[in-house]
Design a protein with these regions (language model features):
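Catalytic core of pol beta-like nucleotidyltransferases
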Residues: 1-28, 34-41, 50-108
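Short beta-strand->loop micro-motif that forms the acidic, two-metal-ion catalytic signature
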Residues: 46-48
Length: 108
């Protein structure tokens, strides 16, 4: 049996409490789990907003222990400045994230 959205959300909350992320401002998830469409093989798409980061966006998730979550997971990690500029840089992605994201820790 594949984990339900409720099980995954509880595991994500516990994971966030065990792994403090420096400068974390907001945390949520989007995609099939957020839409309530997850099934066997679905992964968890995380969205994390941080105050700032010296790393490029593609390197930021590398230090996260995502393998501890009950389903495969990927993360987008944006600085607040990048998040605010996302609608201009990538309007479609910004719209999807705005409409789908279930926030556990809402953005400021």
């Amino acid at each position: 049996r594949w984990p339900s959205r409720e099980e995954v959300e509880e595991a994500l909350k516990a994971w966030l409490s065990r792994h403090p992320i420096p400068g974390l401002l907001a945390a949520g998830y989007f995609g099939s789990y957020a839409r309530g469409e997850a099934g066997v093989g679905s992964d968890l798409d995380l969205l994390l907003l941080v105050a700032h980061s010296p790393l490029p966006p593609w390197k930021r998730p590398l230090g996260l222990s995502l393998e501890e979550l009950p389903v495969p997971a990927e993360a987008l990690v944006y600085t607040l400045e990048e998040w605010k500029g996302l609608p201009q840089r990538s309007p479609r992605l910004a719209r999807v994230l705005r409409e789908e994201t279930r926030w556990l820790l809402p953005p400021p």
